[in-house]
UniProtKB/Swiss-Prot annotation:
The core complex is formed by different alpha and beta chains, binding bacteriochlorophyll molecules, and arranged most probably in tetrameric structures disposed around the reaction center. The non-pigmented gamma chains may constitute additional components. A bacteriochlorophyll binds at H22, H40. Residues 1-23 are cytoplasmic. This is Light-harvesting protein B-800-850 beta chain C. Antenna complexes are light-harvesting systems, which transfer the excitation energy to the reaction centers. GO terms for molecular function: bacteriochlorophyll binding; electron transporter, transferring electrons within the cyclic electron transport pathway of photosynthesis activity; metal ion binding. One of its GO terms (biological process) is photosynthesis, light reaction. It comes from the Bacteria. It comes from Rhodopseudomonas palustris (strain ATCC BAA-98 / CGA009).
Amino acid sequence: MVDDSKKVWPTGLTIAESEEIHKHVIDGARIFVAIAIVAHFLAYVYSPWLH
């Protein structure tokens, strides 16, 4: 890893590889938030004690 100047410590990934992984992590978080919003909306609609 010391030989390759494009790899970043401590992961050993290049900047492009880390940006690609970051994109997937952010996309996954957005999907999680969307599911959570739908779940909270459905809980509000179908729970009489929340009205």
